[in-house]
Amino acid sequence: MEIFGNVVSGLGEGSFFVGLTPYKYKFKELTGFTPFEGTLNVKLKHNFNLDEFNPIEFDGFEIDGKKYFGGKVLLIKLFNKSGHSIDCAIVAPKKTDHSKKTLEIIAPIQLRKFLSLKNFDVVKIVI
Protein backbone atom coordinates (compact mmCIF):
# COMPACT_ATOMS: atom_id res chain seq x y z
CA MET A 1 0.00 0.00 0.00
CA GLU A 2 1.20 3.53 -0.80
CA ILE A 3 0.41 6.63 1.25
CA PHE A 4 1.44 10.20 0.45
CA GLY A 5 1.94 13.01 2.94
CA ASN A 6 3.79 16.24 3.60
CA VAL A 7 6.82 16.71 5.82
CA VAL A 8 6.00 19.00 8.77
CA SER A 9 7.84 20.30 11.80
CA GLY A 10 7.28 18.39 15.00
CA LEU A 11 7.02 19.40 18.61
CA GLY A 12 10.74 18.82 19.20
CA GLU A 13 10.10 15.95 21.61
CA GLY A 14 10.99 13.06 19.30
CA SER A 15 14.73 13.39 19.89
CA PHE A 16 14.27 13.17 23.66
CA PHE A 17 12.07 10.09 23.58
CA VAL A 18 13.92 8.21 20.83
CA GLY A 19 17.15 8.97 22.69
CA LEU A 20 16.02 7.23 25.88
CA THR A 21 18.04 4.02 26.22
CA PRO A 22 15.09 1.65 26.79
CA TYR A 23 13.29 2.99 23.69
CA LYS A 24 16.49 2.89 21.65
CA TYR A 25 17.10 -0.78 22.54
CA LYS A 26 13.47 -1.71 21.93
CA PHE A 27 13.41 -0.01 18.51
CA LYS A 28 16.67 -1.78 17.57
CA GLU A 29 15.11 -5.10 18.59
CA LEU A 30 11.88 -4.49 16.66
CA THR A 31 13.20 -2.76 13.54
CA GLY A 32 16.73 -4.09 13.14
CA PHE A 33 18.31 -0.62 13.33
CA THR A 34 19.40 1.79 16.04
CA PRO A 35 17.30 4.91 15.43
CA PHE A 36 18.63 8.39 14.86
CA GLU A 37 17.61 10.49 17.88
CA GLY A 38 14.66 12.25 16.30
CA THR A 39 11.56 11.62 14.24
CA LEU A 40 10.34 12.84 10.88
CA ASN A 41 6.74 14.00 11.04
CA VAL A 42 4.52 13.44 8.02
CA LYS A 43 1.04 14.97 7.79
CA LEU A 44 -1.60 13.02 5.85
CA LYS A 45 -4.90 14.22 4.38
CA HIS A 46 -6.85 11.53 6.23
CA ASN A 47 -6.63 9.73 9.55
CA PHE A 48 -4.29 6.73 9.54
CA ASN A 49 -5.28 3.57 11.40
CA LEU A 50 -2.02 1.80 12.17
CA ASP A 51 -3.85 -1.24 13.55
CA GLU A 52 -5.04 -2.17 10.04
CA PHE A 53 -1.44 -3.15 9.21
CA ASN A 54 -0.59 -5.45 12.15
CA PRO A 55 1.97 -3.24 13.89
CA ILE A 56 4.34 -4.64 16.50
CA GLU A 57 3.42 -3.53 20.03
CA PHE A 58 5.97 -2.68 22.72
CA ASP A 59 5.62 -2.09 26.44
CA GLY A 60 6.39 1.01 28.42
CA PHE A 61 8.94 1.30 31.20
CA GLU A 62 9.82 3.39 34.24
CA ILE A 63 12.91 5.48 34.99
CA ASP A 64 13.35 7.05 38.43
CA GLY A 65 9.63 6.76 39.15
CA LYS A 66 8.59 8.37 35.84
CA LYS A 67 6.47 6.22 33.55
CA TYR A 68 7.06 6.13 29.81
CA PHE A 69 4.35 4.65 27.64
CA GLY A 70 4.62 1.80 25.17
CA GLY A 71 3.29 1.96 21.66
CA LYS A 72 3.45 0.35 18.24
CA VAL A 73 5.87 0.24 15.32
CA LEU A 74 5.33 -0.60 11.67
CA LEU A 75 8.16 -1.21 9.20
CA ILE A 76 7.88 0.90 6.03
CA LYS A 77 9.91 2.26 3.13
CA LEU A 78 10.03 6.06 2.74
CA PHE A 79 10.61 7.75 -0.63
CA ASN A 80 11.38 11.37 -1.48
CA LYS A 81 10.17 13.09 -4.67
CA SER A 82 13.32 11.96 -6.54
CA GLY A 83 12.62 8.32 -5.78
CA HIS A 84 15.41 7.85 -3.24
CA SER A 85 14.30 5.63 -0.37
CA ILE A 86 15.21 4.11 2.97
CA ASP A 87 13.80 1.40 5.20
CA CYS A 88 12.41 2.92 8.37
CA ALA A 89 9.41 2.63 10.70
CA ILE A 90 6.32 4.46 11.85
CA VAL A 91 6.30 4.74 15.63
CA ALA A 92 2.99 5.39 17.40
CA PRO A 93 3.31 6.03 21.13
CA LYS A 94 0.27 5.19 23.27
CA LYS A 95 0.36 8.78 24.52
CA THR A 96 0.88 11.48 21.91
CA ASP A 97 -0.09 15.07 21.15
CA HIS A 98 -0.31 14.31 17.42
CA SER A 99 -3.55 13.69 15.55
CA LYS A 100 -4.19 10.46 13.63
CA LYS A 101 -3.21 12.41 10.50
CA THR A 102 0.39 12.86 11.67
CA LEU A 103 2.89 10.00 11.45
CA GLU A 104 6.17 9.91 13.35
CA ILE A 105 8.89 8.07 11.46
CA ILE A 106 12.17 6.73 12.83
CA ALA A 107 15.19 5.65 10.80
CA PRO A 108 18.86 4.79 11.34
CA ILE A 109 19.88 8.20 9.96
CA GLN A 110 18.53 11.75 9.90
CA LEU A 111 15.83 11.53 7.24
CA ARG A 112 15.70 15.25 6.44
CA LYS A 113 19.40 15.23 5.51
CA PHE A 114 19.56 11.81 3.84
CA LEU A 115 16.51 12.41 1.62
CA SER A 116 17.04 16.21 1.29
CA LEU A 117 13.63 16.95 2.81
CA LYS A 118 12.18 20.25 3.94
CA ASN A 119 8.80 21.24 5.33
CA PHE A 120 5.87 20.61 2.98
CA ASP A 121 7.83 18.26 0.71
CA VAL A 122 5.71 15.31 -0.42
CA VAL A 123 6.91 11.86 0.59
CA LYS A 124 5.65 8.40 -0.29
CA ILE A 125 5.28 5.72 2.36
CA VAL A 126 5.13 2.10 1.23
CA ILE A 127 3.80 -0.46 3.69
From Swiss-Prot:
It comes from Methanococcus maripaludis (strain C6 / ATCC BAA-1332). Catalyzes the CTP-dependent phosphorylation of riboflavin (vitamin B2) to form flavin mononucleotide (FMN). One of its GO terms (biological process) is riboflavin biosynthetic process. Binds 1 Mg(2+) ion per subunit. Gene3D superfamilies: Riboflavin kinase-like (2.40.30.30). GO terms for molecular function: magnesium ion binding; nucleotide binding; riboflavin kinase activity. HAMAP family: Riboflavin_kinase (MF_01285). The keyword Repeat does not apply. Its EC number is 2.7.1.161. Keywords: Flavoprotein, FMN, Kinase, Magnesium, Metal-binding, Nucleotide-binding, Transferase. CDP binds at G10, L11, G12, E13, G14, S15, I109, Q110, L111, R112. PANTHER family: RIBOFLAVIN KINASE. The gene is ribK. It catalyses: riboflavin + CTP = CDP + FMN + H(+). This is Riboflavin kinase. Belongs to the archaeal riboflavin kinase family. Pathway: Cofactor biosynthesis; FMN biosynthesis; FMN from riboflavin (CTP route): step 1/1. Its cofactor is Mg(2+). FMN binds at T96, E104. Mg(2+) binds at T39, N41.
